[in-house]
Structure formats: structure tokens, C-alpha cells
Amino acid sequence: PAMVLPNMVYALQGNAENMVSIPPAAYSGWEMSILKDLAPELEDVDTTMVNDDFSVNVEALADADVDLVLNWDSETDQAEQLKALGIPCVLVSSAKDMDGLKSLVTMLGDALNCEDRAKQVTDWYDETMDYFNSKADEVAALSEDEMPRVLHFQNVHEMTCYTGGINTYITTLEGGQNFTLPEDITEPSMETILEYDPEIIFISNFDDVTPEDFYENKLEGQDWSNVSAVKNHKVYKVPCGLYRWAPPNTFEKPLYMKWTASIVQPEIFSDYDIRTEISDFYKDYY
């Protein structure tokens, strides 16, 4: 196949030997993740047939005898072109909650003939949701003042944030308030974020920014010195496992949920050790 979501495909197949092409951003994710050790065969994978804007080189894919393409549901026109050439195309969407993520894994399991593995993963998702649902009454009892304001960065340099979808869903589930944009604003600005004054900031692996860059106010053109999360040293770099944990369609999303929950509401989510959870998962699964 040629695809987005190589981390999910690897998780279901247990190998990456049949991956023909992945986007450059997915390749950079491979370089920084444990997938580099688990799937060294991706070192020489093509990154020119599927672009970071998810457009594809239809002719090149046909010449490469690709028998399946996985891409986002925004690429319907190219999917039709591929189908006209006899290349099946599975279109996926960004999960907005854990049910959406389960549906995605099930669909990929069917497409890749990995139904049993997919069922194992969705059972894990169900167990995770059962755990969070068991905390629902405690979370519901929180006052607004007890729910910290949370900002999830996608890319700090570009000032792009996760303002909706599954990350907002998760933040609410664990007792936080996720940053959202006012209706009349389409892109976040420093002014908008300063007005929001996040108490917790999560930064993804789509850039090289570290918490220390915030604490030492090193980010060019941005002054974070008066932001609560920075003053209280509550800026966190999101881990990277098989792939970056922050994006919506990440296989290890339950680990992301438990990791962020232990930061957002440490008193409620205190009945597990996140390092043990992470270590046990990778030992058991791989």
C-alpha cells in the first residue's frame, strides 16, 4: 500500500514490509519514534508519491503496482482517479472521539486482513473508556475553577492548535477546559492565547520546541512570560511512541489519554503509574 497512518498499519500488520510510499511528515515521525527500531525497513521507503498535503502522484502509484491506497477523505477526486486505474482507495477521516477511532481501526483491519488484531486494539480502547467512565462522577463534580484551561499545540512556530475534535473530547473527559477559538476568529493569535491564559500547555512533536523554550522565553516573536502555564512550569512535550501521540488518528491514543489525565487532574487520576502503563503496554503488545 501507499498511505497516511503508517503507525496504525504497522500496529495492525506487525510489519511495514509492504508499505510503498508515505508522506514526508510521516517519515519524519518515523525518524523520531520507536517505529524506527521496530520497522527499520521504512528507512528507504518512498516519500514522493504521497505528499504532506495528502495529494498523490496517481501515475507514479500506478507505475509502482500499488494495490491499495489509504488517504484522507478530503482526497475524493484523486480516489476516483485511482479507482479508474484499478487501484482501491480507502479514505479515512479524523476521529472526533474514541468511537470514531474504533471505527477507523476496524475499517483498516478489514482492508488489511488484520481483523483479529484490530479487535484486540478496539477492546483496549473499550477498556480505556470504561476506566474514564468510572471517573465521570468525580469529573462532573468539579467546579469551573477546578478545571484547568488547556492548550494543545500542533505547531508552536506556526501557531496552530488542536481546538476541536478528539483532543477537546479527551480534555473534557478528564476534567479540563480546552482552548477554543472565538467564532469570529479562524486562526489563533498570540493575543487570543494571552487572553485565554492557558494553565497547562501541551506541545506536539511537529516542531522542535521544548518546555524550556517557553520558560526561558526563547520563542521569536512570542512573549510567554505572563502566561500561567509558563509561570507555573506546566508546559509538557507530548511523547512519541509508534508515532506522535497528539494527532487525532494515533494508535496509542489511550496512553495519551492517561498521560494527559495524570497532568490535568492528578488527584482524580492517581490510581495508576503512567510510566508503568506505558512500559507494560509496549512489552505486552510488541
For the regions a language model picked out, list residue spans one by one.
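A contiguous binding-surface segment within folded domains or other stable secondary-structure elements
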Residues: 185-237
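Alpha-helical, coiled-coil/dimerization segments enriched in small aliphatic residues
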Residues: 160-185
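Short beta-strand and adjacent tight-turn residues that come in two discontinuous sequence segments
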Residues: 21, 71, 92, 181, ...
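A residue-level marker of the well-folded mature domains of exported/periplasmic proteins
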Residues: 130, 161, 168, 191-198, ...
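Extracytoplasmic substrate-binding proteins
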Residues: 78-158, 180, 187-188, 230-231, ...
